[in-house]
Regions:
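Pyridoxal 5′-phosphate
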Residues: 1-239
């Protein structure tokens, strides 16, 4: 794999030396599709060649070993055990996997914030059509203080309880898609524990972007992320 030389300055020189962008292309929207260095591209192609050389051997024996090594590599970034790490196609798939495998009862509510990613909101809407579940949106309008966000959430929970509802789960982000602000997810997890509410974190812009080495200690019920955005992994099929 290509070795990163300290002599290459950060910025345009590094982009041209280590990434696959066209010379006249300046990427301003890394968050949507991500990218990966040339060294990752080269290793990916080596694996493709290995798989094509001995398909049966690769899928039965080589792939499971590589998968376990990849899980072992990600686990320390989150300070969790390898047994808690599972790969999914993307964060939205992870959200769907969690939400569609919970058991709901009449009166259950899912709380989310107005900054929720669109696909996740549509998933909740879909559930509301097929399950005994309601969704409640907590409106926030940035700039907003973290303490005010937590206070709005608690007030919403109390209002729902007084109305005879049960808040089953709260869904929130690590870093918001719009605006690109860091969400107080640690405080939200702690609040959910106090309120006996399941916490689901959409960390699509989490791993590789912000420090998550305390995730194991914070211990949300569910956390899902994307490695292809900020961890420089190959993931999104742009074809």
């Amino acid at each position: 794999m290509q070795k990163l030389e300290n002599s290459v300055p950060f910025g345009r020189e590094m982009k041209d030396a280590y990434f696959n962008f066209a010379k006249n292309y300046t990427p301003l929207n890394h968050g949507s599709f991500g990218t990966f260095p040339k060294s990752v591209r080269d290793y990916q192609r080596d694996l493709q060649d290995l798989a094509e050389a001995r398909p049966d051997t690769f899928l039965r024996y080589t792939y499971p070993d590589l998968l376990e090594k990849s899980r072992c590599a990600v686990a320390p970034l989150l300070s969790v055990s390898m047994d808690e790490v599972v790969f999914v196609p993307n964060a939205t798939t992870g959200v769907n996997t969690v939400l569609r495998n919970l058991v709901y009862q009449k009166g259950d509510v899912i709380i989310h914030f107005s900054t929720i990613y669109g696909a996740c909101e549509k998933t909740i809407d879909s559930l509301c059509e097929t399950e005994h579940i309601e969704r409640v949106c907590v409106h926030i309008d940035y700039p907003e203080e973290d303490e005010d966000i937590i206070s709005k959430f608690i007030n919403t929970v109390e209002d729902l309880k007084n109305d005879g509802k049960t808040v089953k789960l709260a869904m929130f982000d690590t870093v918001l898609t719009f605006p690109g602000a860091r969400f107080p997810w640690e405080a939200m997890v702690e609040t959910c524990k106090t309120q006996q509410i399941l916490s689901l974190i959409d960390g699509a812009h989490g791993v590789g972007h912000v420090d998550l080495t305390h995730l194991g200690r914070v211990s949300p019920d569910f956390f899902t992320s994307n490695c292809y955005k900020w961890l420089f992994c190959q993931g999104v099929d742009k074809n």
